[in-house]
Amino acid sequence: MCVCECVCACVCMCERACVCVCVCVYVCVCVCVCVCVCVCVCVVNCLDRHVHTCPERVALIWERDEPGTEVKITYRQLLELTCRLGNLLKRQGVRRGDCVTLYMPSCPLAVASMLACARIGAAHNVVFAGFSSEALADRIRDAQSSTVITVNQGVRGGKVVDLKRTVDQAVQNCPSVQQVLVAMRTENTVAMTDRDVPLEEEMMKEDVVCEPVAMDSEDVLFLLYTSGSTGKPKGLVHTQAGYLLYTSLTHRYVFNYHDGDVFGCVADIGWITGHSYIVYGPLCNGGTTVLFESTPLYPDPGRYWEMVERLGINQFYGAPTAIRLLLKYGDECVQKYNRSSLKTLGSVGEPINTEAWEWYHRVVGDGRCPVVDTWWQTETGGICIAPRPSEPEAEIIPGMAMRPFYGIKPALLDTEGEVLSSNDSTGALCISQAWPGMARTIHNHHQRFTETYFQPYPGYFFTGDGAYRSKEGYYQIIGRLDDVINVSGHRLGTAELEDVVNQCPGVAESAAIGYSHDIKGEGVYVFVVLKKAAEVQEDVLARQLREMVSRSIAKYACPDFIQVVRHLPKTRSGKIMRRVLRKIVEGNTDELGDLSTLDDPDCVREVIRGHQRLRGDGKQQ
């Protein structure tokens, strides 16, 4: 008998009749998710049913790296492309239950490849096209893929990236790979081997009709690898019905999406945000979704907002790290473009600090667009906590995710595993009942799945994040629990500290970490990136920031060291690599580990030199 409630998720949106029977699928001994086992097809809900009603509606707008060269793909065209690819995959020996690895930039062929896999009953494993060959090989081997799909080269920020070369290096260590399908993003030729298949040439030989395979609701839709605390990536498994239901509902209600809107999520499809809110959620809703291939600074810091004006984007969904980056360049880069089409602004990937939130709302949204600071994870499949949906004029508090989505029941637990039932409490963020979009397991490692997410707090799904529940019952994410600094017995969330530091007029963004301290247990070390036009002496800045932290939090929270850096070490998806900063501060620079995912590896050397100078003079401590 399962002690938690079940969520019934029936995804029978297609026009076909199907017989559904509800069963409980046990994810662990005390958490189950109730779904409808039915004969329905995920890809039919994303394509076929819309082709029946609105074949010429634009499904995808490919915002290519080159500004002003966007390509629009209708639902009819996307279905034909998907069917040709599905038939090609079948000709290459891909069958139901296989897993196809994709190493591609954000482009229509990548979306069609994902949908083609779903159409023939294969799972897809999209790997961000910025990972190294070693990281790609690890994911191919774990997924046991016999087929890889890639492009000759990627184009991003005006630079050409040799993706095919990376795949060639990776598959040398992947004996399972039998064929690599190669599409042409640029006109540059690449070396082809007997294993390689020219994708466009072979695809055009295929028929435009490919009957979809009927799938059960709990059949695998895709694998997506995410970082684990042990360092080995986790191949999280998402399934057909519950995932599609959850992404479509959250897309529609969190962003107040309506038919005819243009949805602009600027994430990469290699991450869960791209899967859920570029591909599956918008397409299931019959929406028009933007594929952004470039960077926020190419060719200039106005790229996002020029795109908003040109494409008439109604909902914009981006990362706080990009917002903080653009904030450095001032308001003019935003205000010279017409953004009247915008109705909702979204934030994803990490907690957004108050200053960035207010700039986003005031400057980008002209003070009229609600900002939805969304909290969720690869594991959750879709948004779990956000300011919307709610009453139209309901309060939105800067920097807070606020309200659980339908069916999500958050719980805060203390270090003893006791539920904190009162408001004005801080604890480990858990979820007390199952929901349709949750991952079902880790590929080939179900024991690791249960140990990671269910054993820490039996009866609850453990998110790994800490959260604060306000007196009003609203939720604020305070950061990963491994990002909590314990100063003299006081728990200090890095997100809370960074939020204060980032309110300094000269600061663009910051990263706070803990380091070993002989007396306090842990001290506080803060890295600061200044705004482009800021001119301030470091000792004056340090004094100012300490005063702000003392006022806003407490004296114990004051940083021991404040180091000004030009850039923070980040992954290509924009996440700060805090483990690298911790190693530098602890003096373990020979143990930095794999830096292949860094966007700018040179910045690490600059951080090391600056740290050595700062600790060498001993002025701040």
Predicted regions and their residues:
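AMP-binding/adenylate-forming catalytic core of the ANL superfamily
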Residues: 102, 127-153, 167, 309, ...
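Conserved ATP/PPi-binding loop(s) of AMP-dependent carboxylate-activating enzymes
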Residues: 403-407, 418-453, 474, 490, ...
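Gly/Ser/Thr-rich phosphate-binding loop
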Residues: 203, 284-287, 314-318, 327-395, ...
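AMP-binding/adenylate-forming catalytic domain of the ANL superfamily
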Residues: 182-183, 519, 551-576, 588-618
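Conserved AMP-binding/adenylate-forming core of the ANL superfamily
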Residues: 44, 56, 60-115, 132-137, ...
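ANL superfamily adenylate-forming
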Residues: 3-4, 35-37, 67, 147-217, ...
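Conserved pre-ATP/AMP-binding loop-to-beta segment of ANL
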Residues: 56-58, 178-183, 187-188, 193-225, ...
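Conserved AMP-binding/adenylation subdomain of ANL enzymes
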Residues: 242-262, 269-315, 325-332
